[in-house]
Amino acid sequence: MLTFQAFIQSPGETFLNLGFITIRWYGLLISVSVLIGLFISKKLAKARNINPEYISEILPSLIIFSIIGARAYYVIFEWRQYSGENFFTSLELFNNAIKIPSFLAVWEGGIAIHGGLIGGLISIIFFCKSKKIHLKTFIDILIPSIILGQSIGRWGNFFNNEAFGIPTNLPWKLFIPIQNRPLEFINYEFFHPTFLYESLWNLLVFIFLILIFNKQNKTDFFRPGFISCLYLICYSFGRFWIEGLRTDPLCIGGLPPFCDGGIRMAQFISIFLFSSGLIGIFFLRLRTYIGKNRKNG
């Protein structure tokens, strides 16, 4: 009797191998995210009467600071992966293998979005101060592109066979090759596609933020900074629950896959960011309320 079993499977991390250079899906997706984000952010900047060229100007430093932050954050909490005999890895370039420190091999995966957000925020603060741009307005312009980039970038985890969830037999289950499975789940073939959950959630958040952005100038309810706060709330809410399914968490005081005796760092940060978003909205509304009373008084 024939049986049909549906599942998702990565075709591999390589998009194109030209012999002298290899293009990986992860790098390609990041590049696509940057180009789409550049286009969207310029449109949003123009809608807020901010010079769209500022987006092009900040882009190099934003990318560099975000990648450094994302990688540093991950390496700090997963140093055991990059120490000892794993300290070096090979970079194939023009048919030659060059040894480099493994923590520099970002294209192999291993970045943390919370670290990227910290690095990106530092870059934005410095840029806004140098150009004398209103910080909250400028961040509101960039935020939709950031969450869309997160949605696209999550597919890099799919191609790298990483950042997946606990075993499952759901129709949309993800097949993971044995060499990529945690030892605790070595005999399981199918796992939750947490990359897909987060990608879809982030896409919904992007659509929601764009709708709010288009209403921001029509009412004083959505003050500058409101979109940034909504991002913190919505993204953190989804990330908290999805993180609970993952088998590769960064842990404080524990070890993957369940951080026994400790806490999942991403969930801890999500609670902090969620709370920060709520507090931010409270103070934005308070300023609006005080401003109205002063006008009426």
From Swiss-Prot:
Membrane topology summary: Multi-pass membrane protein
Residues that span the membrane, as ranges:
20-40, 57-77, 107-127, 133-153, 193-213, 225-245, 266-286
Question: Which residues are listed for a 1,2-diacyl-sn-glycero-3-phospho-(1'-sn-glycerol) binding in this entry?
Answer: R154
Query: Can you cite an annotated GO cellular component?
Result: plasma membrane
Q: Name one Pfam family in it.
A: LGT
Which terms in the Gene Ontology molecular function aspect does this entry carry? phosphatidylglycerol-prolipoprotein diacylglyceryl transferase activity
Q: Where in the cell is it found?
A: Cell inner membrane
Give the pathway. Protein modification; lipoprotein biosynthesis (diacylglyceryl transfer)
- Coiled-coil zones: none
Q: Which InterPro entries match?
A: Lgt (IPR001640)
Q: Does the keyword Zinc-finger apply?
A: no
| General function of this protein | Catalyzes the transfer of the diacylglyceryl group from phosphatidylglycerol to the sulfhydryl group of the N-terminal cysteine of a prolipoprotein, the first step in the formation of mature lipoproteins.
Return the protein name: Phosphatidylglycerol--prolipoprotein diacylglyceryl transferase
Organism (species): Prochlorococcus marinus (strain MIT 9301)
